[in-house]
A protein has these predicted regions:
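Catalytic core segments in nucleotide and nucleic-acid processing enzymes
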Residues: 86, 91-245
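A short mid-domain helix/strand-loop element embedded in enzyme catalytic domains
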Residues: 43-73, 81-93, 98
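Interfaces and regulatory segments of ATP-dependent nucleotide/adenylate/phosphodiester-chemistry enzymes
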Residues: 1-64, 207-245
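Short, flexible active-site loops
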Residues: 68-77, 133-137
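Structural motif
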Residues: 29-33, 78-83
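Generic structural hydrophobic/aromatic packing signal, biased to beta-strands
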Residues: 18-22, 71, 123, 136
Length: 245
């Protein structure tokens, strides 16, 4: 890359900057300098992509089965739980809004711990008075008895009686009986614990919401991905799936 191609470039200012960087890397002839320059370049590319605007082409009509299909396809690629959390948050938000159950559904970024955000779980659903009435813990892996007990210990202090565990991969086989006993124990103590997966919950909720509610849901997923700055690959994937409907 040399300045002899400068006349062919539309953005001559950035071309000159690129030439200067590459010239310095070549002149220094140091692998460490080259590595640092590459890392900085990739970091900047990632930063710009992260801020890129993605258009979500909401379909005019969408059936229950099509909604579930794109949800499944969206979760096929691993995301450390980010995609699952976006779907779950969108579902509870739309259900809460449409049925006037919740004034607001609070959540944080996937990388933030509940302790650091002050939330009891991944999602907090607030009633019209601003009180937390439902909490939702979203698990992209199997739910264990240790995780259940640890989370319930935190929730008991806040006196919330309705608790959902959305366990995408179900319950750990070795813990099924113990988890069942723990759920019964929590009920006696005044807590209703519901262990489900997103698709069992989604099939019922999205049926009750009807077609207008399903359109709201797929739109809300895009808003969740944007609002919590999900990776560009996740946002583009959702946009592509909507375009396939």
């Amino acid at each position: 890359m040399t300045k002899k191609y400068r006349k062919q470039q539309k953005n001559k200012k950035d071309w000159d900057s690129l030439c200067r960087v590459l010239a310095e890397v070549q002149e220094r002839d140091d692998p460490q300098v080259a590595s640092l320059a590459l890392k900085q370049t990739l970091t900047e590319v990632y930063r710009r992509l992260a801020g890129a605007h993605v258009v979500y082409p909401t379909p005019k009509r969408i059936s229950l089965e099509e909604t579930l299909r794109i949800m499944r396809a969206f979760l096929e690629q691993g995301s450390g739980g980010d995609r699952l959390l976006a779907l779950a948050s969108a579902l509870f938000s739309v259900v809460g809004s449409r049925f006037k159950l919740f004034r607001e559904v609070r959540r944080s970024n996937i990388t933030a711990s509940d302790a650091s955000t002050g939330l009891m779980a991944d999602l907090e659903c607030l009633n019209q008075a601003g009180e937390v009435v439902v909490v939702v813990e979203v698990k992209d892996r199997v739910l264990t008895i240790t995780q259940l007990r640890t989370k319930m210990a935190d929730i008991r202090e806040k006196q919330v009686s309705e608790i959902f565990f959305v366990a995408h991969q179900g319950v750990a086989d070795a813990d099924k009986e113990e988890i069942g006993r723990q759920v019964v124990h929590e009920f006696v103590s005044g807590h209703n614990v519901y262990i489900t997966d997103l698709f069992a919950l989604g099939r019922t909720a999205l049926s009750l919401l009807g077609e207008p509610g399903r359109r709201d849901f797929v739109q809300e997923v895009g808003r969740q991905l944007d609002a919590y700055r999900s990776d560009i690959t996740h946002r583009r994937s959702w946009a592509q799936l909507l375009a396939s409907v």
